Amino acid sequence: MSKWYQGNGKNSDVVLYSKVRLARNLADMPFPNRMSKEIKRSATKKIYATLKSSEVAQEFDVIDLSALSKIKAVSYAEKQLISADFAKQRETSAFMLSKDEDVSIMICEEDHIKINSFAPGQDLDAAYEKADKIDDIFIDNLKIAFSNKLGFLTASPINLGTGLKASFALHLPALAQSNAIYKLSAMVGKLGLSLRPLYQNGNGDIYILSNQISLGITEKGAIDNANAICDQIVKQERGARDQLKDNFEFEDKLYRTLGILKSARRLDTPEFLNSISLVRLGISLGYFDIEYKTIGEMLYTLQNASLIDSAKTPLTEQMCEKLRAEIVREKID
């Protein structure tokens, strides 16, 4: 079965993917940070049983992190399917994952239920539709914590109300080149959203745009607002890219970067992310005949833990760098 990240969507030159997260809690249990291990296990069984008895049961696998290695758990976090903190709590953690990995459901992380739904490109509606379908199953069969005044009750006050977080992963290399990211981030913040790097130190020029307000606004309102801001950022990034088209020195830099990737025998993670970012930019400018989904698949699968997990054998840092370079050469040759 193909994975969701192997597809393309609207505005894929800038928007890698859309993500909707819904946070829900059981009304008759304390928040996870106040749960004993026994109560947490009981809640996990209750939530899992609800989904297993539903019409979508065959679409999901349950992943018991306590039965997995640390590397396997971290590989799920690298793919944004679970949080990094959740991956560290392997002893009492479990989540459910759809067959093509477009929906994950963390159980007893910060909240009792956290539904994450992905769609390629700019398509929050598709991501929300999938998350909402799962949400309805839980609401119809479990007593979910809800206040007529505040909406859905969550462990963090930030998520009160809809419990919805709408996000985009944006590739913004041209805006990053022109040092416009900080100004853009400040502007976005004034509109109730945030813009932050996906990877450490801004490697890869990929930024996450997400709403920061879920109280006093409807799900549709939050999604429409996020889409409107995303549209503006896409327009700005494309404008900045247009200014690079006739820059011979920059064109040379892009081709040199592709040449390095085609011949490199070792690639550490920062060099990989930054080089792939430039190649992806070169694709959008019409220089390279490589599919966006090829880049997306590499971003999704070539970080250290994912490499080690796919190799099915322990790898040193140097071995990861060697294997990463080998796979990149095969993918873009």
Residue spans for each PLM region:
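Conserved phosphate/anionic-ligand binding catalytic regions in large, soluble enzymes, centered on
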Residues: G151-A169
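Long, Pro/Ser/Thr-rich low-complexity/intrinsically disordered regulatory tracts in eukaryotic proteins
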Residues: M1-K149, L164, S178, Y182-S185, ...
